[in-house]
Amino acid sequence: MINFQESVTFQDVAVDFTAEEWQLLDCTERTLYWDVMLENYRNLISVGCPINKTKVILKVEQGQEPWMVEGVNLHQSSPESDCPLVDEPRKHRESKDNFLKSVLLTFNKILTMERIHHYNMSTSLNPMRKKSCKSFEKRLPPHLDLLNYNRSYTGENAYECRECGKAFKKKFHFIRHEKNHTRKKPFECSDCGKAYSRKAHLVTHQKIHNGERPFVCNDCGKAFMHKAQLVVHQRLHTGEKPYECSQCGKTFTWNSSFNQHVKSHTLEKSFECEECGKTFRYSSSLYKHSRFHTGEKPYQCIICGKAFGNTSVLVTHQRIHTGEKPYGCIECGKAFIKKSHLLRHQITHTGEKPYECNRCGKAFSQKSNLIVHQKIHT
């Protein structure tokens, strides 16, 4: 066990500066000095360190300044009164910075000594507690509370996450960030039971149930649940094409069309089908594709006996028998067996037309409509 009383003295944690430096401190800094010195003294007494009161402590307890400033009365030197402001020469600014740094170091020393003392007392009463460091730390006074008080004087981020080390200036932002680690979702929808980590997300979700659509297009009157949906829809009226391909310069109205186009430049297709010439990026994709030519269907439905060329198609087919519709529209609640069916349905809400004719630029919401249109050009 560490001999705590022999290893710590008041001088180890005292904040020392000259009378000249004291005269340069402003009201807030002098008040902070009072708090620190008295707190140091009380903390050392509380952990059993025998300390003789120094002249500085006696003066501070009596409401006097450690160093008298010429021309200033005693009653003007208390923390509650207005401190005399002295012009601060540039060469003395470093002294004030060093003072604040020493305050922070002092608080850290006190905190460390208190933890050592409490740990020694705890383990002497119950030696088995040495094996449970984590559980012991949880019973200690919060480390952040004291440090955050100090950081408020230096402008540092006060609230630090113990999980990832990210720091925040505001407690509200810190609490919100912590939920990312704990996965807490306290905001639950009373209609469907779905939970969210933020109240704003719950409010947005509840618009599905009450049918609220506050964002209205000024051109055609169509209403939308989210502002982002309105912005995308308005491109139909303005003709805006914000997505430009850096490879060929072609522009697109919809992000989905743009992403699909970019793949034509970036995807390397090294596996070619000997039957139809279609290329694939992976050999496994080519192997699955070849079943269309051979007619091979190794995956059979156990309910109706229908066979399929790959497992994904079989799984989708079986939903016809089970009635499962896992893909639900957040706008109207309608559910679908296939994800592609959901995506096609959602276009009716957004007004998006991702299928664009290469000849004339006319866009369509359904690919089948584009195919029919292209026959005009051929």
UniProtKB/Swiss-Prot annotation:
One of the GO biological process terms: regulation of DNA-templated transcription
Record bears the keyword Zinc: yes
Listed Pfam families: KRAB, zf-C2H2
| Locations listed in the record | Nucleus
**Keyword Zinc carried by entry:** yes
What's any one GO cellular component for it?
nucleus
- Domain KRAB positions: 8-79
Q: Which GO terms describe its molecular function?
A: DNA binding; zinc ion binding
PROSITE patterns referenced in this protein's UniProt entry, alphabetically: KRAB, ZINC_FINGER_C2H2_1, ZINC_FINGER_C2H2_2
**What does the protein in this record do?**
May be involved in transcriptional regulation.
- Indicate the family of this protein: Belongs to the krueppel C2H2-type zinc-finger protein family.
What name appears for this protein in its UniProt entry? Zinc finger protein 684
- Name the species this protein comes from: Macaca fascicularis (Crab-eating macaque)
Highest classification ranks of the organism:
Eukaryota, Metazoa, Chordata, Craniata, Vertebrata
